[in-house]
Structures are given as structure tokens and as C-alpha cells.
Amino acid sequence: MSGLSNKRAAGDGGSGPPEKKMNREEKTTTTLIEPIRLGGISSTEEMDSKVLQFKNKKLAERLEQRQACEDELRERIEKLEKRQATDDATLLIVNRYWAQLDETVEALLQCYENQRELSSGTEVPGCQEGLTRDVIPRPDPGTSDLREPLPVQFRAPLSEPALAFVVALGASSCEEVELQLQGRMEFSKAAVSRVVEASDRLQRQVEELCQRVYSRGDSEAPGEVARVRTRELGRENRRLQDLATQLQEKHHRISLEYSELQDKVTSTETKVLEMETTVEDLQWDIEKLRKREQKLNKHLAEALEQLNSGYYVSGSSTGFQGGQITLSMQKFEMLNAELEENQELANSRMAELEKLQAELQGAVRTNERLKVALRSLPEEVVRETGEYRMLQAQFSLLYNESLQVKTQLDEARGLLLASKNSHLRHIEHMESDELGLQKKLRTEVIQLEDTLAQVRKEYEMLRIEFEQNLAANEQAGPINREMRHLISSLQNHNHQLKGDAQRYKRKLREVQAEIGKLRAQASGSSHCIPTLSHPDDPGLNALAPGKEDSGPGPGGTPDCKKEMALLAGATSATSSIKKEELVSSEDDAQALTPVTQGLPSRGREPEARPKRELREREGPSLGPPPAASTLSRADREKAKVEEAKRKESELLKGLRAELKKAQESQKEMKLLLDMYKSAPKEQRDKVQLMAAERKAKAEVDELRSRIRELEERDRRESKKIADEDALRRIRQAEEQIEHLQRKLGATKQEEEALLSEMDVTGQAFEDMQEQNGRLLQQLREKDDANFKLMSERIKANQIHKLLREEKDELGEQVLGLKSQVDAQLLTVQKLEEKERALQGSLGGVEKELTLRSQALELNKRKAVEAAQLAEDLKVQLEHVQTRLREIQPCLAESRAAREKESFNLKRAQEDISRLRRKLEKQRKVEVYADADEILQEEIKEYKARLTCPCCNTRKKDAVLTKCFHVFCFECVRGRYEARQRKCPKCNAAFGAHDFHRVYIS
């Protein structure tokens, strides 16, 4: 029954795995759609940590899935083990039935061979000729020829039911049977087919014999007695054949029932042996109780004897200070009554035990009878048993489950195909998305590479131009330095010229002072000479004293020329200074612009001063005509005073006119300066040079005209002067004029040298100016180019930064796409693994389905055989059930008797313990008369319990955690150190960590 229940449980649980697989497939479909959200990422480390967290999460999920799969596999293994156990049991049953079938078939074949041998000697020759084609030569049943199928030419034609049975046996070919059972299957099929053929052949032989007998009887017309005899013999033969088949069927059924009952008998024998052991244990306990009862009886007898003899027990020397204890008659009678009751109880218990033993022996005898009866069970009883019905129900359940498994397998195949197609579509979609993303990424990377190459080219061009500009600046640096040195040398030269001009001014002042002295001397000597000067000519009046001092008129022209040359040199120097300052202002970032603006006014001041000095010198040099020598000195002095006043007024007028001219020239210079500032550099230089040239030419022409006029006046005046004193002065003046002319020649040479040098320097300055202009233009162009390059470089840097940021963003996108691709690859791998697992499980399910289909067909055949056997076993089963019904009350009675016996035993033990306690109390009462003594005795007992049982001196303070027995710590430690590591009471082994102290308060 347990095997059947296990089978049913396995069958019920067999429908579980497909549902779990369905659930697992649903889980896989849900995990496919689950998105991967990493959140905001600021660095690669954070992304790596989040990816690791996601991987750990996925690994945990995979571990959970694996654990769930392992649990499912464990459950499946347990179910398969249970199923294997049930299959083994069924296989054992099938093997047993099959072996019995082979034995019966061999027995039948042996009987048939024996009958053939017996009938071969007694047959009629005519019958032998007729039977030669029907009888097949048969080997021994034990030989290996039985295991080979018979050839077709030796087989006789069979009847329709026999042929159908043989065909059914042949249909159960080796396709459903394993290779190791194939030989046995062939042997069984051959043997059964031969048995069927033999039975059919015998039947046909009998029918042929009957027909021959009838035909011969009709033809030969024998006696009626022979016919009746043959008919009776045929009927008897048929009856005997039917009886033989029935007996064989009964023998087969009985053998099967015998094997089953033999198994049950073995189990009951084991149970009986167990019960016998329990009975022996109970008998041993009863003997123990008897011995204890005898001891108690002895003690009671001694107590009675002491009581009857009037013996008094005095206190012992153990420290109890009690008086004598005497037992009253009432207590003694009570004890006697209790003793008698206990004896009666023991006797009754003994009788009960004997009765139980007798019942046990009767149960054993009935069990043996039942064993014998179980060997012949009717078939109806077997059919009505619960096991047979359970087998039928289980067969129907298995058949229905096989149909359900087929439908579930078809559904699983459909789901697998659908999931496979959806998986393939999903993979194609993912591959197309991946290809599109890769194409986009490639195009973006190519664009970025192109832009990066362009930026690199522009950067290289800018770098080359920057290096060229640096080289050009390095080349222009020494030229600029040379120009600065030249400008500084020209400035130094201008300073030297200014110093010379100051020196000449100082000399001019000295000369004017000498002229003043000469005028004073001349005024003293020529006060009588009448003035013949023209009032309208201020220049002659101004030059008259000079003539008196310096002699003839032409003597004053070299000094004037020298001064004019000095003035021209000063003006050219100022113009060159202006040009140099303009160039230096352009080179030095307009650092000297105030100097260039202030120089024209400084240049005009020295121009105005020499003019005033010349006029001052010319004024006194214009003295009276030579005809004035005849005048008296008083008249001269008067005329001189008047003339001085007139000269002063004329000088004031001249100074005012010069002031006006200077103001006009100042205005012109201001206009020129404004024009110079507004005009470009080259035009300013040209205008300045042309203005200086015109001014110098005008001054030179003016000075030449003045010199001519002075020479003419000197000639006219030289004719008039006749004084010796005048002659002497004239000589001195001529000498001075010669000296001045020599100086003027020297100064002219110097002026020519300076003019040539100025021309050379002007030419060089113009060349340098042009070169500076070109260099400045180149510098401007280079500055513009540098500015352009710098702006382009800034733009390129910005573009480079933007491209780098875009590259970083694209790199992050690429990393994200790579992570997505990796995740998708992981999901694809997981799906492939799941697909492989599903394919493997599908293959396993298909194999299991094939096995189940084979098992189903086997079960069908077994069911057919079982149906055939069930009819045979029904009668035996009914018989066995009746016997079992008879045995069950006996078993119930025996069980009740055993329970009663155990109950009585327990009750006896309780009574004995109760009596023992009473006896101990009575003993204490007898020994100790006082209650204090009883308490002291109990205290002593408790103290004895608290003392160590090993040494009996120290108290218990250590416990063994293995068995929880208590001893003193010194004894336990001593035993541990002496390697006696076992408990003194129960011999349980203990270690170093298996004992510790206990503190009993």
C-alpha cells in the first residue's frame, strides 16, 4: 500500500515541473524588458562602481535563480527516487510473475513432450502419416532452442484466436523493451507461442481423430458399443483437458498468492520475533519484581518476628540521640494487610501474564494457520481488495496524467517555438539597432577626426607664422637698435650744436660788448662830426657804430654771414631733431612727442636772438658820415645824443616790427605744427624740410641784401672818414674784420662741412625714414597678421575646446553604448543559456515522454495481464479476505490483551514503587523515633548527595557538559590530567572544554 501511495504522490507531483517551467519562462520574459538605470554619473570611477553594483545585483539574482533551480531539482530528484523505488517494486513483481510464467510454460512444454513420446509408440501408422505434417520436432525446454522463434515452414496453420494471440505477442517487439530484456522477451514469446501452437495442434489432432473415427464408423459400420465408447472417451478427454487447464490456472494463482503470502509471513514472523523479545523482556522484569517481592517478604517476616519477640531497637551510634522506637500493633496489622494485598496483586498479575503468554501462543498458532490459508486465496477476494482497486485507480490516473503530459508537452513545444522566434526577432532588432548606432558613431568619429585634423593644420600654420614673426622680429631687432643708436648719436650731435650755438652767442655778446666799448670811444672822438645818416634807413644807423669801430663797411659782412650760417645750421638742426624725434616717437610708442612739439619754439628763440643781436650790432655800427669830421665836438655830442635817441626809437620800432614778424612766424609755425600733426609722417617731414629750406633761403637772401647795403654804406662812409683817429680805428676795425672774415671763412667751411654732413645725414635720415616706414609697415602688417593669427588661434582653441567637450560627450555616449551593448550581450548570453537549458529540459521532457509512453504501453499490457490475472485472483482474494476477517478479531483481541498486559505491568510497577516508599517511611519511623532525627537523617542524605562520589570528601562543584554528571573539580581535573577522560558513572568521554565549575548555594 505504501508503494502505491508513493506512486500516486509521484503521479500527482509529476504535473508540477511543466508549471514551474512555464513560470520560469514567464520570469525570463519579464527580465528581458527590465531597464538598466545607472542614474547621474560624474566620473568613470562612479560609473565603474555603479556597474559593479549592477553586476553584483545581477549575480545575486542569478544565485537566487540557481538556488531555486537547485531546490526544484532536489524536489525532482526526491520524486524520481520515490518513483524509482515504486518502479523497482513493480519491476520486482513483474520479474517474479514473469519467472513463474516461464516456469509454468516450461512445465507445460515438458508435459507436452512427454505426452508426445508416450503417444508416438501407440499411434496407428495411418495416423502417423497424417500427423507428420502437423507435429513439429521440439527440443528440450531447457535448451537454447526455445529462445529462438520457430521457422515458418515448420509452423502449422493456427486457429483465429490463437493466431490473434500470437500476433499480439509478436507486436510487442523489442522496440519497447530494453536490450538486456530482449532475449528473455523472445524466449517468453517463443515459449508461449509454442504452448499455444501445441494446444491448438492437440485440439486439431483430437478433432481429426474424431472425424476419422466417425468416418470409419460410417464406412465400416462398427458396433454401436465402440462408437459410444469413443464418444465417451472424447468427452472425457475434453473434460480432462478443461480440468487440466483449470488446475494449471489454479496452480498459477496459488503460486502467485503463495509468493505474496510468503512475503507477508516473513513480515509477520519478524513482528512475532519482536513480540517474543518484548515478552522475554517482560518476563525478565517480572522475575526482577518477584525477587524484590521475596526480599520484601523476608524483611516483613523479620519485622514480624521482632515485633512478636518484643524486640526494641535502640538508637545507633551515628549521632542520633533518640530513645527507643516501638511499633504499635495497629501499624503492624496495617503492614500485614498491605503485604497480603500486595501478594494477592502480584499473584493476579502473574496469572494475567500467564494468560497473556497462552494467548500469545494461540496467536502464533493461528498465525501459522493463516499462513497456510493465505497460500490458497480465491480470485474474487483479490479483485475485491483495496490494493487491486488502488492499482486500477492508479492506472487510470497514470493514463490521464500521460494524456495531460502530452498536451503540456505540445503546449511547451509551442511556447518554446514562440519564445525562440520572439528571441530571434529581438536579437535581429538589437543587431540592427547596434549596426545603426555603430554607423552613427563611425560618422561622428570621422567628422571629429576631420575637424581635429583641420584644427591641427591651422594650429601648425599659426605656429609656423608665429615662429616666422618671431624670426622677423629678431631680425628687425638689431635694425631698430641701430636706428636708436643713430638717433641717439644725432641727438648728441644736436646737443653739441646747441652748445656751439651757446658758445657763439656768448662770443656774440662779447663782440657786442666790445662794440659798445668802441661806440663809447667813438662817441668821445667823433662828437663833432655831423650825422649824415638817412633817417629812413634804420639799418644804416644801426651799422654806423660798427663802421666807426671796425673800419670799412665790407669788414662786417663775414661776421653777419657767419651768424646767418649759424642760424641756418640751427634751423636745420632743429628740423633734423624734429625728424629724429618723430621717428623715435614712432619707435618708442610716442614717448618723445612733447619734445617734438616744444622744439620749434626753442628753434625760433635762437633765430630771433641772432636777429636782434645783428640789428643791435648794425645799429651802433652805422655812424655819422665822413663829412661830419669838420663839425665840432659839441655839435657831435648833441647830434650823438639826438642820434642815440633816434636810434633808440628806431630800435624800438625795429624790435616792434621784429616782434610782429616773430608773432606772425609763430602763427605760421603753429599752423605748420597743426598741419604737421594732422598730416602723415612722410608729408610732415617733407613739409618741415621745405619750410625750413624756404625760411633759410629767405633769411640768407635777406642777410645778403643787408650785407650789400652795409658794404655800400661802408664804402660811402669810408670816403667820408678822414680822421687819423678814425683811420686808426678803421685799421683796427679792418684788422678785426679780417680776423672776423677769417673766422667767417672757417665758419663757412664748417658750415659747408656741416651742410654736406647735414645733406648726407638728411639723405641717410630719409633712407632710414623710408626703411623705418617700410619696417613699420611690415611691423603693422605683422601685427595685423599676429592679431589675426591670435584671434584665429583663440577661435581655434575655442573650437578645440568645444570639439574636445563634444569628443568627451561622444566618448561618454560611446561608453554608455558599450555598457548597453555589454548588458545586451549579457542578456543575450543569459537568453542563450536559458534557451540551451530549455532545450535540454525539452530533450529531457521528450525522453521522459518517450519513456512514459513506453511505460504506458507496458502498463497497458500489464493492465491487460493484470485484468487476466485479476479474474484468476478474485476467488483466492475472497477466500483470503474471509480468512483475514476471521483473523482480524483474533489480532484485535491479542492487541487488546497486550495493551492490557502492559497496563497491568505499569500498574504493578507503580504499586511496587508506592509500597517501597511506604516501606522506607516505615523503616525511618522504626529507626528514628523523633522527627528531628528524621530530618537530620534526610539532611545527611542530602549532604551525601552533594559530596563527590569519587573521593567522598569534597563537595560537588564541577559538571560534565556531555552527560551532566556532577563531581568535584579536583577529581575531574585529576582524571583529565591522568588521561582517564571518561565519566565515572556513565563512561561518557569528555574533553578539555566539556567540564566547568558549578556553584551550589
Curated annotation (Swiss-Prot):
Give the multimer and partner information: Component of the RNF20/40 complex (also known as BRE1 complex) probably composed of 2 copies of RNF20/BRE1A and 2 copies of RNF40/BRE1B. Interacts with UBE2E1/UBCH6. Interacts with RB1 and WAC.
Protein source organism: Mus musculus
Post-translational modification N6-acetyllysine, affected residues = 20, 355, 517
Which protein, by its recorded name, is this? E3 ubiquitin-protein ligase BRE1B
State the superkingdom.
Eukaryota
**Family in the record:** Belongs to the BRE1 family.
Gene that produces this protein: Rnf40
Q: What is its main location?
A: nucleus
Query: Residue ranges of the RING-type zinc fingers?
Result: 948-987
Q: Which UniProt keywords apply?
A: Acetylation, Chromatin regulator, Coiled coil, Isopeptide bond, Metal-binding, Nucleus, Phosphoprotein, Transferase, Ubl conjugation, Ubl conjugation pathway, Zinc, Zinc-finger
User: A Pfam family in this protein?
Assistant: zf-C3HC4
Where is this chain's protein located in or outside the cell?
Nucleus
Query: For the modification Phosphoserine, which residues carry it?
Result: 42, 584-585
Q: EC number(s)?
A: 2.3.2.27
Task: Return the Basic and acidic residues bias intervals.
Answer: 18-28, 602-619, 633-647
What does the record give as the function of this protein? Component of the RNF20/40 E3 ubiquitin-protein ligase complex that mediates monoubiquitination of 'Lys-120' of histone H2B (H2BK120ub1). H2BK120ub1 gives a specific tag for epigenetic transcriptional activation and is also prerequisite for histone H3 'Lys-4' and 'Lys-79' methylation (H3K4me and H3K79me, respectively). It thereby plays a central role in histone code and gene regulation. The RNF20/40 complex forms a H2B ubiquitin ligase complex in cooperation with the E2 enzyme UBE2A or UBE2B; reports about the cooperation with UBE2E1/UBCH are contradictory.
Give the PROSITE patterns listed for this entry. Answer: ZF_RING_1, ZF_RING_2
This entry carries the following GO cellular component terms, namely: HULC complex; nucleoplasm
Region: Disordered; residue ranges are 1-40, 122-142, 519-647
